[in-house]
Design a protein with these regions (language model features):
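N-terminal glutamine amidotransferase
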Residues: 1-41, 56-59, 151
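Short, hydrophobic/amphipathic alpha-helical patches that form generic packing surfaces
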Residues: 7-21, 250-262, 381-398
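Acidic, carboxylate-rich catalytic segments that either coordinate divalent cations
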Residues: 10, 354-408
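ATP-dependent adenylate-handling active sites, centered on carboxylate activation for C-N bond formation
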Residues: 35-244, 266-315, 332-333, 382, ...
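Active-site-adjacent bridging/hinge elements
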Residues: 126-134, 257-262, 283-285, 357-367
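PAPS-dependent sulfotransferase catalytic core
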Residues: 318-376
Length: 408
């Protein structure tokens, strides 16, 4: 790379993204929250406050003169509620709902179609056969080595329909949507768990982001230490909050701030689409972070987003809502079998990330051969992350690849 300070910055970025799937050393677009932000406060009529706040954000950001607006519609609670309030607020606006259908993946597109019809929105389904095909173009926009870039396809489609794109971003982090994580974390820890034990338990709840032999991935130029990773997460768990609230804090200060927001914002700028996120307004962030925990998550039934569900019940019957959280997600095992394995073999067998001394060639060859026999999802995810790093390297370090290159 050349400059030593640039090298160090990039090495840190590489380690973080390949372990956490985000880089917490970057400056976030919205402020991090502290543990004090998650102290409970008594509230009255929270559903009314939340709904009116979302409605006011829509009016403020869009106005009554706008003729057409796009919405990302996964079929889940957050996007369905956002669509419901959008239609109830702007009764005459033309709404284009966008859903993504990935080949070989389970999705909520059929559910989304019913919800779109209910609120008189034109439903557009973007079919993605090869999820990795336009990876060089997407990486050239965000300038970071990420592979899971579904938002690229959403915004690209939105640009052809409207100058506005509204979404339900923030619902999981602010209203308790990661129920699978809460249940697992609480089962792995207790009130006497140390800070380090809770950090390790939290990482276990993100086990698809890293692999058991994580430290062996890196080569001589990049020194990996789990202790450095623990240090990033420590403020979220070294505080007097109850364990559940500590997870709320860690979730907000993690992928939301350092993955989804910066990446989505880069796509919005590139395609010149104005984003509207009614759930993620500063007003709602300040309000919802202090909500009593039992208004977010019911541990007995393992159900989250309790307040959003209550509001949405005014607009939709329960049977119209997806029972299992899905969102826009690709089946990585099927992606690996159809395109990922061949692309990783082609680009990583003589990878520039190996020549640069970043990634361990022996690890690549050993794990690749094992994946041929048994594609484990954690290692598939890791190889897709390494493929993204290889593309980033060829775009910005060796500069031998063009953004228009298609991975086929």
């Amino acid at each position: 790379m050349g400059d030593s300070s640039t090298d160090d910055t990039n090495y840190l970025m590489i380690k973080n993204i390949l372990t956490l799937r985000y880089n917490p050393t970057k400056r976030s677009l919205i402020p991090k929250l502290s543990w004090r932000n998650f102290l409970e406060k008594n509230v009255s009529n929270p559903t009314h406050f939340i709904e009116e706040s979302m409605r006011n954000t829509i009016i403020k950001k869009i106005g009554h003169q706008t003729k057409r607006i796009s919405i990302a519609l996964s079929g889940g609670i957050d996007s369905a509620l956002t669509l419901a309030i959008l239609r109830d607020t702007l009764t005459n606006v033309n709404i284009d709902a966008i859903s993504i259908r990935f080949a070989g993946s389970i999705d909520e597109v059929d559910q989304a179609a019913i919800i779109a019809e209910k609120f008189e929105a034109n439903h557009h389904v973007v079919h993605i056969e090869n999820y990795l095909k336009e990876l060089p173009k997407a990486i050239s926009i965000i300038k970071l080595p990420f592979w899971d870039l579904h938002w690229y396809h959403v915004v690209k489609k939105a640009k052809s329909l409207s100058n506005f794109l509204i979404s339900g971003d923030g619902g999981d982090e602010l209203f308790g949507g990661y129920t699978f994580r809460y249940k697992k974390f609480l089962s792995l820890t207790n009130e006497d768990s140390t800070t380090l034990e809770k950090i390790k338990a939290y990482l276990q709840c993100h086990e698809r982001d890293w692999v058991p032999d994580q430290e062996k991935i890196f080569s001589k130029k990049i020194t990996f230490s789990w202790n450095k990773i623990y240090d990033f997460l420590k403020p979220n768990f070294d505080n007097p909050l109850p364990r559940l609230a500590q997870v709320f804090l860690a979730d907000f200060n993690g992928k939301l701030l350092y993955n989804w927001l910066p990446l989505n914002s880069a796509f919005h700028r590139h395609f010149e689409v104005k984003p509207i996120t009614p759930i993620l307004s500063q007003e709602l962030i300040s309000y919802t972070s202090h909500l009593p925990y039992n208004l977010k998550y019911d541990g007995q039934s393992n159900i989250g987003k309790l307040l959003l569900r209550k509001i949405l019940a005014k607009y939709l019957t329960r049977k119209l809502l997806a029972t299992k959280k899905q969102g826009f997600s690709v089946n990585t095992i099927n992606l690996w079998k159809s395109y990922g394995r061949e692309l990783c073999n082609y680009y990583l067998s003589d990878g520039r990330i190996l020549r640069q001394g970043w990634i361990n060639e022996k690890w690549i060859k050993s794990r690749m051969s094992k994946l041929d026999n048994e594609p484990q999802i954690r290692y598939v995810n890791k190889f897709l992350g390494l493929l993204a790093l290889e593309i980033w390297c060829r775009l910005y370090v060796t500069k031998e690849m063009k953004p228009t290159t298609l991975l086929v």
